[in-house]
């Protein structure tokens, strides 16, 4: 009957996303989009997405492409609207393109997302789906980093001069925020450095704003995915 047919159609739509061996990487792709949008700290107006490795060979049409866009729209991996993400993106005026790329020394399930926001913010994120719906952020704006975004994470771009690490760590200590990991990356050519700090507690919003106005701090990004 009609009802049975409707059910079949729904199953056809949801099938590739919910079942099968690719589902953990589909979940990973949604999370890559979701975290990238949080890192942009703005609604995505334009996305240029490059797929590498097995994402490039199976990504288009296997749901990876739709999953990435769904994440950029703020969806979670269990959202039933994922298969319709392209249409939903068009409705909110998000432009997006997909192409393939070959990266050196990158994980096989890797995507590079070049994003522009509604308020002029821009970011380039290179991230990998590492299985089980987990992801690894490998590069931010061309600088190699290494974090999962599973804990509250504070990312500080600053001019590479003494004192900035101490400013940030002492501020966190004052606010009783415990540092779980601190990684420091330096871009010799650009003369700036990036701190990636994972914390055990949330970082208060006013602390983030205080950091932003410090001399020599270029950009502060804070994500707490419990949001």
Model region roles, listed by residue range:
Residues 84, 98-101, 125-227:
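A conserved regulatory-domain signal marking ACT and ACT-like small-molecule sensing domains
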Residues 58-66, 108, 194-201:
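Short glycine/threonine-rich loop-to-helix capping motif typified by GTGT followed
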Residues 15-33:
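Conserved phosphate/anionic-ligand binding catalytic regions in large, soluble enzymes, centered on
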Residues 39-48, 108:
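Non-transmembrane, aqueous-exposed alpha-helical and coiled segments at domain scale
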Residues 1-7:
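Short, Lys/Arg-enriched N-terminal segments with co-localized hydrophobic residues
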Residues 48, 52-91:
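A structural-propensity feature for long, helix-poor, extended segments
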Residues 73-123:
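Contiguous domain-boundary segments centered on the initiation and propagation of an alpha-helix
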Residues 19, 35-42, 73-77, 91-95, ...:
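Generic secondary-structure signature for well-ordered alpha-helical cores
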């Amino acid at each position: 009957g009609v009802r049975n047919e409707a059910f079949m159609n729904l199953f056809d739509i949801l099938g590739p996303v919910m079942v099968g061996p690719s589902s953990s990487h589909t979940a990973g792709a949604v999370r890559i989009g979701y975290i990238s949008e949080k890192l942009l700290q703005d609604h995505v107006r334009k996305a240029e997405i490059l797929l590498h490795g097995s994402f490039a060979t199976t990504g288009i049409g296997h749901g990876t492409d739709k999953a990435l866009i769904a994440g950029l729209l703020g969806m979670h991996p269990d959202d039933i609207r994922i298969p319709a993400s392209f249409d939903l993106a068009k409705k909110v005026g998000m432009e997006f393109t997909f192409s393939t790329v070959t990266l050196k020394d990158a994980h096989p399930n890797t995507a590079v997302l070049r994003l522009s926001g509604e308020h002029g913010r821009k970011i380039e994120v290179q991230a990998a789906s590492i299985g089980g719906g987990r992801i690894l952020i490998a590069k931010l704006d061309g600088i190699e980093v290494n974090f999962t975004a599973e804990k509250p994470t504070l990312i500080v771009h600053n001019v590479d001069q003494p004192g900035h690490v101490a400013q940030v760590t002492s501020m966190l200590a004052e606010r009783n925020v415990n540092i779980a990991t601190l990684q420091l990356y330096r871009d010799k050519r650009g003369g700036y450095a990036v701190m990636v700090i994972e914390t055990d507690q949330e970082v208060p919003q006013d602390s983030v704003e205080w950091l932003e106005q410090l001399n020599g701090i270029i950009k502060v990004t804070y994500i707490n995915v419990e949001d």
